[in-house]
Amino acid sequence: MARKKGREIHGWLIVDKPAGIGSTDVVGKVRWALDAKKAGHAGTLDPDATGVLAVALGEATKTVPILTDALKAYDFTVSWGAETSTDDASGGVVKTSDARPDEAAIRAALPEFTGEIMQVPPAVSAVRVDGARAYDLAREGEVVELAARPLWVESLELLGAARDSAELRMVCGKGGYVRSIARDLGRKLGCLGHVAQLRRIWSGPFEAGDGFAFDRIDRANQAEIEAALLPLQAALADLPEMQATEIGATRILNGNPGQVLGHAEFGEEVWVSRNGRALCIGRYMGGEVQPSRVFNLG
């Protein structure tokens, strides 16, 4: 598809991503369909994963870091008895085991994977190693030892167990790899494992029910897709909202500290609006907000 300059359009389209397509390809499809000048996404999904992919348009891209840092929830199936090169079903089998865990053993192991944990990303991942993506190095046959990174796991719940697989739900913070959880849980249980299926069911304030089916994008016209857009501020649900005074709004839109009504903790990150229009994200400084990202909505 040829590159187009695009038009100014702002907001979020929550796409229900199917398996077999990359997150950046989804963003490109949305941008093309809406003739949008600017687009991005908050939180990459593996090509084989499905579910909530939040696509930001225009000034909503300035709120992507907020959503990227938000908790996200995943439903996934772990297949026991084999570890793969990618830690999911797309990779080749590298180790096998005849052992199988019972439900009690699985439940007993889960607490070790909750709270603040250290996680080694999959060898085939977007993590950068000396400037190169780990998955590019893996394709070139280079063996890369990735360093463990901290991850907050809010909860890890067993939804169901069979002899050769288990269904789980994980709620975690930024940078979590479900594939690593499946791999490490399989090792802990002595049976090995990999992700067979993975679906993101919510991301911050956005849920699967908000999702616009990916295959509808080609069939729908621009007006139908625009009707599904959520406002820019939908991603800011976890931040306190402050109301700017008339003079404060003018100052904020010029990048200066502006007067607001209400109170928050000194230095707390907030977002500011005036007459229903989002103005900025910034820090509350006692009666004023110092903007860090101003929304130029025209």
Curated annotation (Swiss-Prot):
NCBIfam families: TruB. It comes from the Bacteria. The gene is truB. Responsible for synthesis of pseudouridine from uracil-55 in the psi GC loop of transfer RNAs. The active site is at residue 46. Pfam families: TruB_C_2, TruB_N. The keyword Isomerase applies. GO terms for biological process: mRNA pseudouridine synthesis; tRNA pseudouridine synthesis. Gene3D superfamilies: Pseudouridine synthase. The keyword Mitochondrion does not apply. This is tRNA pseudouridine synthase B. Keywords: Isomerase, tRNA processing. Coiled coil: none annotated. GO terms for molecular function: RNA binding; tRNA pseudouridine(55) synthase activity. Its EC number is 5.4.99.25. It comes from Paracoccus denitrificans (strain Pd 1222). Belongs to the pseudouridine synthase TruB family. Type 1 subfamily. It is an enzyme of class 5 (isomerase).
